[in-house]
């Protein structure tokens, strides 16, 4: 609880610098329920790493897989880190079954957030959406495409 109290204190101090942003505190168990039952009520969730990991994994039930979820860890003064929410997924490494969408969308997020390249980010997102609309799906989405096939299809739709 001590770290949660410190987190709340720092969040309240930082929030004062952003008067155009509404700060709302919510316990993680309540946030987890709302994230699943009414995800549109959240714009941005800011939390410490442990709760962020829990909430991001739980939110994967919305699209049905971690394989389509990008993530970013932003730094106030240094570079940001962009990666698939599932991390390196060592249990499926080298098997050709990983869904590349989360990595590809992480690149789109990087283009937009770190480089201001909105047009490039939108091109990538459109290519991913078009590929999914065409019914090209990896196994985690109920399809048959392997990692290389999904990547090639997205590239073809750029």
Model-derived segments and spans:
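Short alpha-helical patches at coil-to-helix transitions and adjacent helical residues
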Residues: 4, 8, 100-104, 147
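Short Asp/Glu-rich motifs
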Residues: 3-4, 35, 130, 150
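Alpha-helix capping and helix-loop boundary segments enriched in small/acidic/polar residues
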Residues: 2, 97-98, 141, 145
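Glycine-rich phosphate/nucleotide-binding loop
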Residues: 33-135
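Glycine-rich phosphate/pyrophosphate-binding loop and the adjoining helix
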Residues: 119, 123, 127-158
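Glycine-rich phosphate/diphosphate-binding loop of Rossmann-like nucleotide-binding domains
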Residues: 1-29, 41-44
